[in-house]
């Protein structure tokens, strides 16, 4: 075991402790998969990232991403958070405006706009949802069929059952049966905000999002980049969302996550602010 630089970064927020925290071991060299998984299980955060030298010559760094239950090939908030930590720890990208991360899905491009980072959404696979799955999921959510607008399987490295609901209020009212969902699917729900509603701090947000991932030992994720990427690719392509919008997530968990979506030249970019809250060392 040795002392390694370590950070906890709050992602999808410009205000510390209001987003989704991410643990980042800045140098994971020499650790095996079992050691990484055990540490991720111990942190109990949605994801823990281990930064490594890239093996692809086009990449600036490599990230291995773990939930408390298993390693994932890609996730959004770890992509933004690990890039922020890499830059803050002296990382120098090959390009002034772009950083390239190597992870399980290959190369992910990140764009820098001042303090904000955005990643280009990886390729999405979509599929129709079978009633044999949809019915039990709606039951586990306590969701009336009339409140559901559309459903899709969405896979960009993580497989989500995406549900478009009739309103943000419906999204926020859900009281899921997490043990039931654990055996069914990871579920992402999104609903539009009513622009005619009373003024609030989320007036500029177009959608409300929630992510239920009990299968990854995360009953509700505070803010989820991979899910927001997949939802944006689906909804924008099908004309169900504008080309640029802001999504709010984490409201029921007393967070204020903000995810910035932009469609540019056929690509979906998913952006957010991040704040390093803890910086020190860990013995691993």
Please provide the spans of the model-predicted regions.
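Active-site proximal loop and beta-alpha junction motif in alpha/beta enzyme cores
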Residues: 1-74, 80-284
